[in-house]
């Protein structure tokens, strides 16, 4: 009985103390899975924009002519705020 209790407690601690990457959102994780980098405002000259990470962050990935890799466009839930119309 004590062995079962000990195993149950160890399993509980393993579940509760498991490493969790909570700092990345789903779009940032998808960008990293495509070998991309989230950059602020603009991508470098040798990079293509393959999506959006956050408000002003863009998912950028280096393009290589010799090794083309298809990249799906990453759509973000964020929409730019409407600009006020001047009357």
From Swiss-Prot:
Glycans are attached at residue 33. Keywords: Disulfide bond, Glycoprotein, Secreted, Signal. This is Beta-defensin 109D. The keyword Glycoprotein applies. Belongs to the beta-defensin family. Residues 1-22 form the signal peptide. PANTHER family: BETA-DEFENSIN (PTHR20515), BETA-DEFENSIN 109B-RELATED (PTHR20515:SF3). InterPro entries: Beta/alpha-defensin_C. Has antibacterial activity. The gene is DEFB109D. The keyword Acyltransferase does not apply.
